[in-house]
Amino acid sequence: IAGHCVEYLPGGKGLNQAVACAKMGAKTALLGRIGNDTFGTELLGFIKKHDIETTYLQSSSRPSGIAVVTVDAQGQNSIIVVPGGNNDINAEDTAAVKISAGDIAVSQLEIPLEAVTAFFRKAKNCGAVTLLNPSPIRNLPDELINLTDILIVNETELSFLCRRPLTDNTSPQEIAEAAQNIKSR
């Protein structure tokens, strides 16, 4: 497959979410593991440039996580995620995060499910609101679904979670019903 351009950009769902929050003026912290590599150095500089708290970032002996995104001529993307050190994030890491009532705890699935679930459990116990972007999509434990206040999904993710195909011909009412069924399964 021949391509016609390449860009190297800092990101990942978690970092993109943190940058968006920080740009909106929210006090933002990021939990993650950064490798001792060129990507890690660039990521750390980018994170600091956006005034994101780095207290919960740890160095990893594994490489920094990366994603390779391809976009076809129709604008459809395909993403390969290699989590690197972020795959080592665990419940103990999330226990260290300071969360207060009224905070918004945001996560995605580029870290282990057990860590996301522990983070949301702590957030709910502290009175925070939880927001989950379940990508890359996979089966979610019922506990995580029940701990999630706000679920941000695209068409593919919604189809997967409600276990039924959704197409351009699916009515808004059917989509709403499918979304409601996620919590009640």
Predicted features, each with a name:
Residues 1-33, 38-52:
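Glycine-rich phosphate/adenosyl-contacting loop at the front of the ribokinase-like
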Residues 4-7, 31-36, 54-64, 133-135, ...:
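Beta-strand->loop->alpha-helix junctions that form or flank phosphate-binding loops
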Residues 33, 55, 59, 69-104, ...:
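Conserved phosphate-binding/catalytic loop of the ribokinase/pfkB sugar-kinase fold
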Residues 37, 87, 110-114, 134-138:
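Short beta->alpha connector loops
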Residues 51, 84-91, 130-137:
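Short gly/ser/thr-rich secondary-structure transition/capping motifs
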Residues 122-185:
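Conserved phosphate/ATP/ADP-binding segment of small-molecule kinases
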